[in-house]
């Protein structure tokens, strides 16, 4: 059971959970490895007057698939350091491919765009979106997509297509971009936690460089400090529109 899953169980079930001394949740990470060459070997055997020589061989080391990848491809993209009002980020680079940052399961897909400017319901402001829960226990949210390339229940690996950057939801009134949020999963449909609970830039920066920086510990720590966030969000007036 992941640290995030245990914290969610305690918060939702309203039971006491005694914590041992703080430890970091185990995170499956795979460092990028440069292929290496095994030393060449030459073996000679002699039987009577006949000598047999084995040709030197080389063996390339296995290069594991990265645990995390930069989730935007096909365009140069940019992003700031903060988002107004809460912890998330907007990524700019219209038409960029949006891909899975890690392995996991697609849990929510919305292909309609119910946002109405006159009402401006924050539950619908994301337009077309995709949410996935990584095998690391973290939830990843991509909003304002144009085309969507996946379905609910799809199992994805790092780099699998989720959609393209677009201008749906309240992005119709602004610049084409993708809203990227990182949070923990909630047991019921909501939008307040889903939109983002930690700042993504340092993770995007690392993944862009091929570094395997996991948000698991930060997400777990934030959940521990806000154990009622999911329950509060579920009771919000517009939760059913999320």
Locate predicted features.
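Surface-exposed, glycine-biased beta-strand/turn segments
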Residues: 19, 32, 47-129, 158, ...
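Short histidine-centered loop motifs in beta-beta connectors
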Residues: 92-94, 99, 133-160
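Short glycine/proline-centered loop/turn elements that form peptide/ligand docking sites
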Residues: 149-150, 161, 167-176
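A short hydrophobic beta-strand segment most commonly corresponding to one strand
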Residues: 177-189
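Bacterial N-terminal signal peptides that target proteins for export
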Residues: 1-6
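C-terminal motif of bacterial Sec signal peptides marking the signal peptidase cleavage site
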Residues: 14-16
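A generic structural motif
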Residues: 110, 146-149, 166, 186
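Bacterial Sec signal peptide processing site at the extreme N-terminus
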Residues: 19-29
């Amino acid at each position: 059971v992941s640290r995030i899953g245990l914290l969610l169980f305690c918060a939702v079930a309203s039971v006491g959970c005694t914590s041992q001394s703080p430890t970091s949740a185990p995170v499956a990470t795979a460092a990028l490895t440069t292929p290496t060459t095994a030393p060449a070997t030459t073996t000679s055997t002699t039987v009577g007057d006949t000598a047999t020589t084995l040709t030197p061989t080389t063996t390339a080391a296995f290069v594991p698939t990265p645990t995390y990848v930069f989730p935007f491809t096909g365009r140069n993209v940019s992003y700031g350091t903060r988002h107004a009002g809460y912890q998330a980020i907007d990524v700019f680079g219209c038409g960029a491919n949006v891909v899975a940052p890690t392995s996991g399961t697609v849990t929510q897909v919305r292909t309609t765009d119910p946002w109405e400017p006159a009402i401006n319901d924050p539950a619908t402001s994301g337009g077309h979106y995709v949410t996935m829960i990584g095998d690391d226990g973290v939830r990843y949210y991509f909003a304002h997509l144009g085309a969507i390339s996946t379905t609910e229940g799809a199992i994805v690996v790092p780099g699998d297509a989720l959609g393209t950057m677009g201008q749906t939801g309240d992005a119709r009134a602004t610049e084409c971009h993708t809203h990227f949020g990182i949070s923990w999963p909630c047991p019921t449909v909501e939008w307040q936690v889903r939109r983002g609970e930690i700042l993504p830039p340092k993770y995007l920066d690392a993944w862009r460089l091929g570094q395997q920086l996991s948000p698991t510990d930060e997400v777990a720590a934030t959940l521990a400090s806000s154990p009622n966030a999911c329950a509060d969000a579920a009771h919000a007036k517009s939760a059913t529109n999320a």
